[in-house]
């Protein structure tokens, strides 16, 4: 599951659980689906999902605003909506950027 530019799918996650945890393929698939369903259910209710050393998924409300049709330039109202946001932890940011000092401190001011 490593490599530049690869998209990791549900099947890849299930296979990783199968190989690393030792569950059957059916159990691994059920486990991955259960975790994803729980995260989805929490987000639908507007709850924040915080995974230590990984990051937080949260739902934010966006108010109505005026946008523009790029073809015509006409102003168009954009309805209020909820959007899902992921905020990576400092540890994940460090791992992605190759800073593996492991203390969890963020080296860049956000």
Curated annotation (Swiss-Prot):
Protein name (database record): Integration host factor subunit alpha
Family from the record: Belongs to the bacterial histone-like protein family.
GO cellular component: a single term: cytosol
Pfam family, one: Bac_DNA_binding
An example Gene Ontology molecular-function term: DNA binding
Keywords: DNA recombination, DNA-binding, Transcription, Transcription regulation, Translation regulation
SUPFAM superfamilies cross-referenced by the UniProt entry: IHF-like DNA-binding proteins
SMART domains: BHL (SM00411)
Protein task: This protein is one of the two subunits of integration host factor, a specific DNA-binding protein that functions in genetic recombination as well as in transcriptional and translational control.
GO annotation terms (biological process): DNA recombination; positive regulation of metabolic process; regulation of DNA-templated transcription; regulation of translation
Keyword DNA-binding set for record: yes
Subunit structure: Heterodimer of an alpha and a beta chain.
Organism: Nitrobacter hamburgensis (strain DSM 10229 / NCIMB 13809 / X14)
């Amino acid at each position: 599951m490593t490599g530049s530019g690869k998209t990791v799918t549900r099947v890849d996650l299930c296979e990783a659980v199968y190989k690393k945890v030792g569950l059957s393929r059916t159990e691994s698939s059920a486990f991955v689906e259960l975790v994803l369903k729980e995260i989805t259910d929490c987000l639908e209710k507007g709850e924040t999902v915080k995974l230590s050393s990984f990051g937080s998924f949260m739902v934010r409300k966006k108010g109505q605003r005026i946008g523009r049709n790029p073809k015509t330039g006409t102003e168009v109202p954009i309805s209020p909506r909820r959007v899902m946001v992921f905020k990576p932890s400092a540890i994940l940011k460090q791992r992605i950027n190759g800073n593996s000092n492991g203390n969890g401190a963020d080296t860049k001011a956000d």
